[in-house]
Regions:
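Conserved glycine-rich cofactor-binding loop
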Residues: 18, 25-26
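Conserved glycine-rich Rossmann-like NAD(P)H-binding loop of the short-chain dehydrogenase/reductase
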Residues: 41-55
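The beta1-alpha1 cofactor-binding region of Rossmann-like NAD(H)/NADP(H)-dependent oxidoreductases
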Residues: 72-83, 117
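Substrate-binding pocket helix/loop in short-chain dehydrogenase/reductase
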Residues: 96, 110-112, 119-121
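Active-site helix of classical SDR
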Residues: 135, 171
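Residue(s) in the substrate-gating loop at a strand-loop-helix junction
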Residues: 155
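SDR active-site lid
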Residues: 188-258
């Protein structure tokens, strides 16, 4: 599997560093771990809540599996993050730390008024507060060593708000604002930040999405997942390669995919009226769950 990746050269900004990747059991997180293991001399800490899938990530690395250390961790649990940080920080030995906050979940709940408060808060706890917790745990070390890189995964839904995704959009706009604020705070240091806005990526995030609320049936949920799978245009491997390249170039903002670039452009040109265009595209791509049958 690793020989299919055409990554950047071995002698790079990753050389001798420690890379922490959340959400490394599948999708872009797994691909980043595998590409790093196959092409870079660095220590990789792969984190996820799903232990079996983490073990598969390690196994897929083949002869490079010794570079990947797997750790079961739920970014929604502050105690787990604090315990993980307490065990890892003493082992870093002033090496450059690269933190990739990739873990995320999706929610199929319908409109905001139909979304249970506990489901909304669950998603924010993972997608937004998980990023904040991980950054809070490891940024002091970066400041102490005056080096490092924080990569936070937002989304095209952190560029454009869309219906029936109020929780997800809130979390991804939050990640964007958090990352951009950090960029300003760290401008006089050697610590870099990157905010990533992927478009449709061929990953399992919709397969692990949670259906909640009173307006989303199992059939509608499955139809939405099937439509997303067809509409997703970028492979996880391609997205991972672009994200890792940001560490080499110092790029601070990355929009992935032609669909992502389209949304980025239209929201810049038409910051209010883009809504009508996006609604039409969303209904065409994913269907209109509120249309009368």
């Amino acid at each position: 599997m690793l020989n299919t990746f055409n990554c950047i050269v071995m002698n790079s900004n990753f050389t001798g560093s420690v890379v922490i990747i959340t959400g490394a059991a599948s999708g872009m997180g797994r691909e980043m771990a595998l590409q790093l293991a196959g092409h870079h001399d660095c220590r990789i800490l792969a984190l996820d809540i799903r232990e079996k899938d983490l073990q598969e990530t390690n196994s897929l690395a083949g002869v490079h599996s010794d570079k990947i250390e797997i750790h079961v961790l739920d970014v929604a649990q502050a105690d787990m993050i604090n315990a993980f940080a307490a065990s890892v920080l003493p082992t870093l030995n002033s090496k450059k730390l690269i933190l990739i906050n990739n873990a995320g979940v999706a929610l199929a709940s319908g409109r905001f008024v139909d979304t249970p408060a506990e489901a909304f808060e669950w998603l924010l706890n993972v997608n937004l507060h998980g990023v904040i917790r991980m950054t809070r745990a490891f940024l002091p070390y970066m400041l102490q060593t005056n080096q490092g890189h924080i990569i936070n995964l937002s989304s095209v839904f952190g560029l454009a708000g869309v219906e029936s995704n109020t929780a997800y959009c809130t979390s991804k706009f939050g990640n964007r604002g958090f990352t951009e604020s950090l960029r300003m705070e760290l401008i006089d240091t050697n610590i870099r930040t990157t905010c990533v806005h992927p478009g449709g990526i061929k990953t399992n995030i919709t397969n692990f999405s949670v259906a909640a609320g009173t307006r989303i049936s199992k059939e509608a949920h499955q139809e939405s997942k099937d439509r997303f799978a067809k509409a997703a245009r970028t492979t996880a491997g391609s997205a991972a390669k672009q994200i890792l390249h940001c560490v080499e170039t110092g790029k601070q903002r990355l929009v992935i995919g032609s669909d992502g670039k389209f949304l980025d452009g239209i929201t810049r040109l038409f910051p209010v009226s883009y809504t009508k265009v996006v609604v039409g595209l969303m209904h065409k791509s994913f269907g209109n769950p509120y249309a009368k049958k």
